[in-house]
Amino acid sequence: MAIPSVISSLVTVVYNMADTFFVGQTGDALQVAAVSLTNPIFILLMAFANMFGMGGSAIISVALGENNHQSVKKISSFISWASLVIGAAFAAVLLCFTAPILHLFGADTSTFEFARGYTVYIAFGAPFVIWSAAASFVVRAEGASKEAMIGSMIGTIANIILDPVFVSGLGQGAAGAAIATTIGNMLAALYYLWYFLKKSRRFSLAPKDALCGTHIAVRVCSVGFPTAIFSALMCVSTIVLNLILVAYGNAPVAAIGIVFKANMFITFLQMGLANGVQPIFGYSYGAGDIKRFADTERFTKLCCFVVGLAATALYFFLREPIIGLFVDDSGVITYGVQMLIAYMLSGPFIGFLFVNMNCMQSVGRALPATVLSVLRQGLLLIPLLYLLNAVFGLNGAVLGQSITDYVTIALSCVVWRRIRR
């Protein structure tokens, strides 16, 4: 079950890398910097998607283990309609307040127009981004991992095909990358719509099922809240880091955007393993099969460590070619190589955090997972970024994420061990 999830995660990585890669082929570091500055927008969209998708999939897995098919219908319908409504509201805010939002993110006169073009088109795709991502989690919870993977691949393949057409062929640059992303998410959303209506016998899109009262809504959101907080605070910390780096010029901003995308391979590879087995965690807990739960946890952590170590080693030896693949600018490449080394220091062990958090969510212990998310992307990371920048400058600031990762990994192991007892 985890293999399609891993493939879906890698597809997501390729999806996110595509925009930066094709914009980088324009040879304009300012456009790469502009796309980097808008990263928080996509991260925030994924925060909502993760809240509905991860929360819903965990509750659906438990409901399936209990053979409660009526709850599955209500949860799936609620997730779908909530995703579309939140996406539409998010788009309205982006379109109405584009300029102040981008200035808050650190855009200046040289990057603003590029960032604005990208943001406007991403806004139009917001409902589809949220629902297609949330639906992939829900479909996987039903045991249809292959179908979830297909949905992700449809959006990614479309994006990869359309990126060069809009970015270079039609000369739209950064805005063209956003157009391709929006169309890709629309196609993925159409596929999941087909699955809900024609393939699944348990899911529902009926509005009457979505109006399920506050009980299911609270359960979904509370379980998915740790993952959503993880993404939302990642948005805030990304903005903070961008604002710190802007003081050193646009080259470090462009470099960190590339490093974020490149490092996603290491992170999402392990996140895919953890997410792929979450239905097993939920089903095993719902059915009272504690041995299966524990065996799955141990095996998943071992897999995360092995693939994390291998990916980190690969990145270390190929660090300069990896950054150079995205942009042909010596200044950006120099910054990027240094930043990539700093970010991949926690690569072999970050999967332990994801597995521990998923275990906590699957047994209904959302609060500890929420606290860990807040620490990793907020309460610990953001002050640390400012402190390290003040003491060690740019080189210190880019070490903040890896230091925070190791602290939260250790805490998650201690907390989950106590819960498991």
Predicted regions and their residues:
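N-terminal transmembrane alpha-helices
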Residues: 1-21, 25-26, 40-55, 59, ...
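Short runs within selected transmembrane alpha-helices of multi-pass transporters and secretion channels
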Residues: 122-140, 148-156, 177-190, 271-274, ...
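Transmembrane helical elements of multi-pass membrane transporters/channels
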Residues: 1-19, 121, 155, 184-188, ...
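Short alpha-helical transmembrane segments in multi-pass integral membrane proteins
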Residues: 1-2, 60-127, 169-225, 281-346, ...
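Small-residue-rich hydrophobic transmembrane alpha-helices
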Residues: 32-92, 129-148, 255-317, 350-369
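Residue-level signal for transmembrane alpha-helical positions in Major Facilitator Superfamily
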Residues: 14-15, 52, 93-97, 127, ...
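Helix-terminus/linker motif at the lipid-water interface of multi-pass membrane proteins
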Residues: 14-33, 102-109, 165-172, 232-265, ...
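Hydrophobic transmembrane alpha-helices of multi-pass small-molecule transporters
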Residues: 44-47, 159-164, 189-193, 265-268, ...
